[in-house]
Design a protein with these regions (language model features):
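C-terminal segment of N-terminal export signals and the immediately downstream linker at the start
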Residues: 1, 18-27
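N-terminal export signals
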Residues: 6-22
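Hydrophobic targeting/anchoring helices
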Residues: 25-136, 145
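Extracellular ligand-binding/catalytic regions of CAZymes and related secreted enzymes
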Residues: 25-37, 44-74, 252, 351-430
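Helical hinge/lid and interdomain linker segments adjacent to catalytic or ligand-binding clefts
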Residues: 27, 33-34, 39, 43, ...
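Extracytoplasmic/secretory-pathway proteins
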Residues: 109-113, 167, 206-209, 421
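Catalytic beta-strand/loop cores that center a nucleophilic Ser/Cys/Thr
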Residues: 136, 143, 240, 270-395
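A glycine-rich, often tryptophan-bearing local segment used as a flexible ligand/cofactor-contacting loop or short
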Residues: 181-317
Length: 430
């Protein structure tokens, strides 16, 4: 019978041989470093992020090798790291000092960099207590990779809990307080009835007259979290509606079913775009029956006459040594990725603030997919769409099984965002 310890050692040797077949097996068990490739040699791209994250949790030094072997990771050659990689099915290779020195010499000569990661970020996901684990792609990615997180919602945000975290994720929350504008088209559906009841009860418990007022206050708290140095990552509806909520202070942008009064017909002209993170000069959707919020979204998936077909988006190349943050956010083993729908699928170029960094777009299209920027001492990153491996995303679809998509380039972008707050800030020479 093979003991567990022997199995782990055999697994580590096998995986390392797959990473670099020429290395003798007797050198694979003990070495100063553990190298995790992130190119096509990797057998489990998504779980590799979890291995790096847990090494940081143990207080180990991790380096992110930007633009080298698909954005590889270099860990100490500890027994804990080797065991974790083996049990996670992650391709990992013990390497010696000479191998690392040669790799870093190559990195120094090209558009690459070795970025030290200092500590595991404290992660929070903003979601209702009753949200299922498969309700958003980030929750699924975190669970699959083995990254621990806390779930928080309005009461925790209003209670100051954001200060306990470094990184916050938002997904399909509608910060305009209109229940994703599903009310008229899905009236009577049990899931919608529960959503409305839960949100109304929360708003009342926090002293707000209605859900739109509650969500606007939550959006302002989240913006304050970023200003004080927090890292915000949002997808799908949360991207667009967060900015609409921030820019609509004193402006009624909600339908009557949400706050008892109709939307101000002149709302688009009254918005305070200086308060928004990413967008400006958007035109709001006036119809309460169309599940579209504004022309920020380029694909308009729920507007029959404006809906755009899916294509693919291309990740931009950045200077790893000069622009390490943008470079970290686009690390991947693929540069062109199939697009996927969400209530907010993409971001029109026309509505982007000049300060926004575009990380990925559909070449030649009037929209982009993946953007980044700063607010105060912190940063935000917006990624359009709901689930990279569920391109059409219909209500009631079965949850995505990430074990079927361990190499998903779309999901890798999510996990890049989880790790980049751990990076040691580098002073640039001027």
């Amino acid at each position: 019978m093979i003991r567990r310890r022997e199995f782990v050692g055999m697994a580590a040797a096998s995986l390392a041989t797959a990473a670099w077949p020429g290395l003798p097996v007797h050198r694979l068990i003990v070495a100063p470093y553990l190298f995790i490739p992130m190119d096509d040699a990797q057998s489990e791209h998504l779980k590799a992020y979890g291995v790096a994250y847990r090494a940081l949790q143990r207080g180990e030094r991790v380096e992110w090798l930007i633009n080298y072997r698909g954005g590889a990771f270099l860990l100490p050659g500890s027994a804990a790291a080797a065991r974790d990689a083996a049990l996670s099915g992650v391709t990992a290779q013990p390497v010696d000092d000479g191998t690392v020195t040669a790799a870093k010499a190559e990195i120094a000569q090209g558009n690459m960099d070795a970025v030290p990661l200092e500590k595991a970020p404290r992660v929070a996901v903003y979601a209702p207590p009753t949200a299922a684990p498969w309700d958003d792609a980030v929750t699924m990615a975190l669970n699959y990779a083995g990254v621990k997180f806390d779930k928080i919602w309005d009461a925790e945000v209003q209670g100051g809990r954001l200060a306990d975290f470094d990184w916050l994720h938002l997904h399909h929350e509608d910060f305009t307080g209109q229940y994703s504008k599903f009310v008229l088209n899905y009236a009577g559906a049990p899931w919608l009835t529960d959503m409305i009841s839960q949100n109304q009860a929360m708003a009342r418990s926090l002293g707000f007259a209605n859900v739109p007022a509650d969500k606007r206050a939550i959006a302002q708290r989240i913006a304050g979290f970023v200003e004080r140095g927090g890292f915000l990552f949002a997808m799908c509806t949360a991207t667009e509606t967060l900015d609409l909520a921030l820019a609509s202070d004193g402006v009624d942008i909600a339908a009557a079913y949400a706050d008892g009064t109709p939307m101000d017909p002149a709302a688009s002209q009254k918005m305070h775009w200086d308060q928004a993170l990413a967008f400006e000069n958007a035109r709001l959707e006036q119809s309460p029956t169309i599940a579209v919020f504004s022309d920020i979204d380029g694909h308009q998936v729920n507007s029959p006459d404006r809906r755009q077909p899916l294509g693919s988006f291309t990740l931009f190349n950045f200077s790893a040594k000069i622009d390490p943050v943008a470079s970290m956010l686009v690390q991947n083993h693929r540069q062109v990725i199939p697009d996927f729908y969400g209530l907010t699928t993409s971001f029109t170029r026309r509505t982007l603030k000049p300060s926004v960094t575009v990380l990925a777009d559909e070449p030649g299209a009037p929209w982009v997919k993946y953007i980044h920027g700063e607010r105060g001492q912190g940063t935000w990153t917006f990624y359009g769409g709901h689930d990279p491996e569920d391109p059409q995303h219909q209500i009631g679809d079965a949850p995505t099984d990430l074990s079927v998509h361990p190499h998903s380039p779309g999901y890798r972008l999510i996990l890049n965002n989880v790790l980049f707050p751990a990076a040691k800030k580098k002073e640039l020479k001027t």
